Amino acid sequence: YYRETNSMRTIKNLLQDECRLGIVRYAAEYDRKYKDFFESKGFLYELITEFRPVLLFGADSSLARKETVSLSNLAEKIELAYADPYVPSVPAGEIKKKELPERLRRIVLFDRSSLLELLSHNPDTFVCTSPVSEDLRRRYGLISRTLAEPSKQHREVLLYRGDYKLTEFDRAFLTEL
């Protein structure tokens, strides 16, 4: 089975032996801090993917009519964001300020299914997230666009304890990712 959670909880679950594998997502600029932390805890890690976030919004959104979306187009929209401002050895307040800059309207969510439902039912919402499959976009009636302004590179990393050996099933799972 799998459990959707945030980076800090994923790390805690691995440390407490509640799971064998975890996936952690972070901005590439923090790569060294994360790797140092992983190594200090005896974790092994493998890069799954690197990506630049994309904008995702409902097909009924006014943004859907634009080929290029800029930050100014988002001013009157409601941002949906994940509540995961964790970076090892950096104060949470500093990360929150940098990763979630002040906006007039933001809804902070924990799970992806709630986020997808909100996007599909509220044309005033958007999220800046990892690329989403065509199947998922079609299922929820969503549109994806690249933000006109440059965005930060992000990484998704598989994480597991140093004493754990990946199984054939684990490898098959990673191939599917």
Language model features: what each stretch is:
Residues 165-176:
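Short amphipathic alpha-helical coupling segments at ligand-binding clamshell hinges
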Residues 39-46, 51, 107, 113-163:
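Beta-alpha-beta core module
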Residues 56-63, 155-166:
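A bilobed periplasmic-binding-protein/Venus flytrap-type ligand-binding module shared by bacterial periplasmic
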